[in-house]
């Protein structure tokens, strides 16, 4: 019985195996020979169906239930058949309205755009190379910082440009008429040949001018301060009213009559004038050799006042010391109130010699400051003596 069952099972398996192989060959050959040309033209759905049937046949031979798989495979077949290859899209090579276009008419950053910004040849473009109204343009008429602009600032040949090389009213211009710091400007400050220029070389009214008429610190200015030959110049060499002038009549520090620090001025301060202060021969000069009210080392009044002020003792010390020696004080000088340092000593006046000690006061006494040896010296003596005593005691006990 066992042999029969084994034979039956083996025969069933062999039959299923032959059926599976046969079905596989049929479907695979059909799939290969659908178009008969090449493998690229084989339909993907046919290959999928052949593989599904092959797996189903193998499942039957092994005793599996292929119904669920077939039922699950049916919708997959429909989905695979519905998939169609997409048509390739055509590339549009021409876009008429795009930005950043190479030849666009209104494109930004365009190479030849008429109104493009940063355009190379744009008429109204900013930063344009040849734009008429462009800023920072090379040949723009009204461009700022333009090379040949008429009204451009910092322009090389601008008419009213600031810091322009040949501008008429330009500041700091080389040949400007009214330019400041101009080389040949008429009214320019710090100009080389300006008429009213400050610090001008030949300006008539220029300050610090070499030949200016009213220039300050001018070399030949008439009213210039610190001028070499100016008439009213301060610190002028030959100025008539110049201060510190060498030959000025009213100059201060010169030889003028009213000059300060003048060498021969009659009323000059510090000179040889009659009213000069600190003068060598001045009659009323303070601090001179003939001063009447000056304090001198040999003056009796001044020296006496200084000595009296230095010898006046402290009132509090006098009162305290008087209370201590009231009963013993006489017409002779008492001992010093201290044994070291500065103290006070006193005695009775002649008219208070007969007064009772209780009636004495500060007005009845003569006082003065007394100075004794420094207290540090006494302390040193005491300390040294104590040291010697200690050494002697130690020597005796040892």
UniProtKB/Swiss-Prot annotation:
It is a lipid-anchor; GPI-anchor. Disulfide bonds join 336-370, 340-375. A lipid is attached at residue 375 (GPI-anchor amidated cysteine). Residues 81-89 are annotated as: Required for the binding to heparan sulfate proteoglycans (HSPGs) on the surface of host hepatocytes. Residues 241-291 are annotated as: 3 X 17 AA tandem repeats of A-G-N-N-A-A-A-G-E-A-G-A-G-G-A-G-[RG]. Residues 66-93 have a biased composition (Basic and acidic residues). It is found in: Cell membrane; Cytoplasm. During host cell invasion, proteolytically cleaved at the cell membrane in the region I by a papain-like cysteine protease of parasite origin. Cleavage is triggered by the sporozoite contact with highly sulfated heparan sulfate proteoglycans (HSPGs) present on the host hepatocyte cell surface. Cleavage exposes the TSP type-1 (TSR) domain and is required for productive invasion of host hepatocytes but not for adhesion to the host cell membrane. Cleavage is dispensable for sporozoite development in the oocyst, motility and for traversal of host and vector cells. O-glycosylated; maybe by POFUT2. Essential sporozoite protein. In the mosquito vector, required for sporozoite development in the oocyst, migration through the vector hemolymph and entry into the vector salivary glands. In the vertebrate host, required for sporozoite migration through the host dermis and infection of host hepatocytes. Binds to highly sulfated heparan sulfate proteoglycans (HSPGs) on the surface of host hepatocytes. The N-terminus is involved in the initial binding to heparan sulfate proteoglycans (HSPGs) on the surface of host hepatocytes. The N-terminus masks the TSP type-1 (TSR) domain which maintains the sporozoites in a migratory state, enabling them to complete their journey to the salivary gland in the mosquito vector and then to the host liver. The unmasking of the TSP type-1 (TSR) domain when the sporozoite interacts with the host hepatocyte also protects sporozoites from host antibodies. The TSP type-1 (TSR) domain is required for sporozoite development and invasion. CSP has two conformational states, an adhesive conformation in which the TSP type-1 (TSR) domain is exposed and a nonadhesive conformation in which the TSR is masked by the N-terminus. TSR-exposed conformation occurs during sporozoite development in the oocyst in the mosquito vector and during host hepatocyte invasion. TSR-masked conformation occurs during sporozoite migration through the hemolymph to salivary glands in the mosquito vector and in the host dermis. Belongs to the plasmodium circumsporozoite protein family. This is Circumsporozoite protein.
């Amino acid at each position: 019985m066992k042999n029969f069952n084994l034979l039956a099972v083996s025969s069933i398996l062999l039959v299923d195996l032959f059926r599976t192989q046969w079905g596989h060959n049929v479907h695979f050959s059909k799939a290969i020979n659908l178009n008969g040309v090449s493998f690229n033209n084989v339909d993907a759905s046919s290959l999928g169906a052949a593989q599904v049937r092959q797996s189903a046949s193998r499942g039957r031979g092994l005793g599996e239930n292929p119904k669920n798989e077939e039922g699950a495979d049916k919708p997959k077949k429909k989905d695979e058949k519905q998939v169609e290859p997409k048509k390739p899209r055509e590339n549009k090579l021409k876009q008429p309205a795009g930005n950043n276009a190479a030849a666009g008419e209104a494109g930004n950053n365009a190479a030849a755009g008429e109104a493009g910004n940063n355009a190379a040849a744009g008429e109204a473009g900013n930063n344009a190379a040849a734009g008429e109204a462009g800023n920072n343009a090379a040949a723009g008429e009204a461009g700022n910082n333009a090379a040949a602009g008429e009204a451009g600032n910092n322009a090389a040949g601008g008419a009213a440009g600031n810091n322009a090389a040949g501008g008429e009213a330009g500041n700091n211009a080389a040949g400007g008429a009214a330019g400041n710091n101009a080389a040949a400007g008429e009214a320019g400050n710090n100009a080389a040949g300006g008429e009213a220029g400050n610090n001008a070389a030949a300006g008539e009214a220029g300050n610090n001018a070499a030949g200016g008429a009213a220039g300050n610190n001018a070399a030949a200015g008439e009213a210039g301060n610190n001028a070499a030959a100016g008439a009213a110049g301060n610190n002028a060499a030959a100025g008539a009213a110049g201060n510190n002038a060498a030959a000025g009549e009213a100059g201060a520090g010169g030889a003028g009559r009213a000059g300060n620090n003048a060498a021969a001025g009659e009323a000059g301060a510090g000179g040889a004038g009659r009213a000069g202060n600190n003068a060598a021969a001045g009659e009323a000069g303070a601090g001179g050799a003939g001063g009447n009210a000056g304090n001198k080392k040999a003056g009796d009044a001044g020296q006496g006042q200084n000595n009296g002020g230095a010898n006046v003792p402290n009132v509090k010390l006098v009162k305290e010391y008087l209370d201590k020696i009231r009963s013993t004080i006489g017409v002779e000088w008492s001992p010093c109130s201290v044994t070291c340092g500065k103290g006070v000593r006193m005695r009775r006046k002649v008219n208070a010699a007969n007064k009772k000690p209780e009636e004495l006061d500060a007005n009845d006494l003569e006082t003065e400051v007394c100075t004794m040896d420094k207290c540090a010296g006494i302390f040193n003596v005491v300390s040294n003596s104590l040291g010697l005593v200690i050494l002697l005691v130690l020597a005796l006990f040892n």
